[in-house]
Design a protein with these regions (language model features):
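Beta-strand/loop-rich accessory regions of lumenal/periplasmic or secreted enzymes
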Residues: 21-23, 55-216
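Short, intrinsically disordered, charge-balanced linker/junction segments flanking boundaries
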Residues: 1-4, 209-210
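M14 metallocarboxypeptidase catalytic domain recognition
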Residues: 11, 29-30, 66-67
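Functionally constrained cores in energy, signaling, and assembly domains
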Residues: 7-9, 32, 76, 104
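Exposed aromatic-hydrophobic patches
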Residues: 12-19
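Short, small-residue-biased leader/transition segments that mark boundaries at the very start
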Residues: 3-8, 217
């Protein structure tokens, strides 16, 4: 939202010029913009930026758990209009919605991002060089799956090249929604990024995603 305010006050309360949603995830972004030019500060300069998130509870559809199909090499999770396939030695390898394949490659953990100028100045690429390939060569050593209530939970246990372990839980409900939980168990606590890579097919030209503030660009 945008609203004018006197910057000379220590605190200012500005009502939102729109109604807040009754359900769902809402993000409010507030910026402080320099109105007039000052010595060394041009007009329009963004002096401050902040975000506030509100997650209004949304009632889930009450659907039975999807079907769990276990095979020698793969584990499948099927529901109306969707299918997930996990490879026992790879992890999540396929997501289909309404017959359309979404993934172009295996979903895998990722710990690296493009270094910024500040990172370069602090020699962080040298310090954290291990993480550049840690996710690329992470190995899925074990895959388990079970039905719990309205969910099928598949757990992929990864081992990094230095022996650290990373379990990832995929909880899939009857509507095809997948909640992912990554639990870090390693001894190294400083790393450039902690996330998952989802290689999507090039044919998917209209994809939207939600990215929280201050994550990697």
């Amino acid at each position: 939202s945008s609203a004018a305010s006197d910057v000379y006050k220590r605190q200012e309360h500005i009502p939102f010029p729109f109604a807040l949603p009754e359900a769902g995830l809402a993000c409010m972004t507030v910026t402080a913009i320099q109105r007039a030019a000052l010595p060394g500060i041009p007009a329009g300069y963004e002096a401050a930026l902040g975000q506030v998130w509100h997650n209004y509870a949304v009632a889930r559809l009450t659907l039975p758990a999807p079907q769990l199909v276990e095979m020698d090499c793969n584990v499948g999770v099927k529901g109306e209009g969707f299918e997930y396939i996990f490879g026992r030695g790879k992890g999540l390898v396929s997501i289909r919605y309404n017959g359309v394949q979404l993934l172009d490659d295996t979903v895998r953990p990722n710990f690296w991002r493009a270094p910024t100028n500040n990172d370069e100045g602090c020699a962080e690429p040298f310090t954290f060089a291990f993480w550049k390939t840690a996710g690329l060569y992470a190995r899925c050593d074990n895959l388990t799956a079970e039905t719990k209530g309205d969910f099928v939970i598949a757990r992929a246990n990864y081992t990094l090249p230095d022996g650290q372990t990373l379990p990832i839980d995929f909880a899939i409900d009857g509507a095809g929604r997948c909640d992912i939980t990554m639990t870090w168990q390693g001894t190294r606590t400083e790393l450039p990024e902690f996330g998952l890579l989802f290689p999507l097919r090039r044919e998917l030209t209209e994809v939207s995603y939600l990215c929280l503030l201050y994550t990697s660009d």
